[in-house]
Amino acid sequence: IPNTSNRVDFILTGEDENHHQNYVLVELKQWEKAEVTDIPQLVRTFVGGGYHNVDHPSRQAESYDLMMKSMNEGIYGNNIGGYPCAYLHNYEQKHPEPLLDDRYKDLVRQAPVYFQNDYGKLEETFRKYVGHGKGMAILYEIANGKIRPSKKLVECIDSLYQGNDDFILIDEQNVAYQTILKKSEDLDHKSTIIVKGGPGTGKS
């Protein structure tokens, strides 16, 4: 992901049946279960040796996709379409399934979640968007695309200075942001929240 230490897990490139250039961005998760939280866009699962609130996989995939579309000239300069999704290959879907809870429906609509037994659906997604060849040429454009903000991103930053909320937060940034918002809504008294992080991690 441009200007971050984050990496996309998996990308397939190719054309669809209408000869549009596309890529499918896949966020891979080894999770086996997850729980809903009362904090928007976040779920609770076992990572890093304990249970933590983290971005919903769909939200993570979509944020990575938005960053690439905003910063990679090979993508926005060639009108390459991006289709994010998440594949939880160790996760057997529950009924009801926490990750498909109504509170996450907008996220899942933007970036579908595929579970352990959904490999057929994932294959259909690949065939639909990138199953008609020319993948190497498209991958070359992405891999060699210059990292510079698109006009759309520049307009977005200008919009921020006008007081609008348009920023793309990824991973821990979004977890911190959503947690702070929830805390501020729940508290009925003045409070101080300290955000800890190294240089360039997005604290501001």
Regions inferred by a protein language model and the residue ranges of each:
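Accessory nucleic-acid engagement/destabilization modules that flank
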Residues: I1-A143
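General structural signal for secondary-structure boundaries
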Residues: P112-Q116, S150, I170
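Conserved ASCE P-loop NTPase core motifs with emphasis on AAA+ ATPases
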Residues: Y140-D158
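Short glycine/proline-rich turn/loop motifs
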Residues: V154-N164, H189-K190
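N-terminal pre-P-loop "Q-motif" helix
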Residues: D165-S191
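Hydrophobic anchor at the beta1->P-loop junction of P-loop NTPases
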Residues: V195
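The conserved Walker
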Residues: P199
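Conserved lysine of the Walker
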Residues: K203
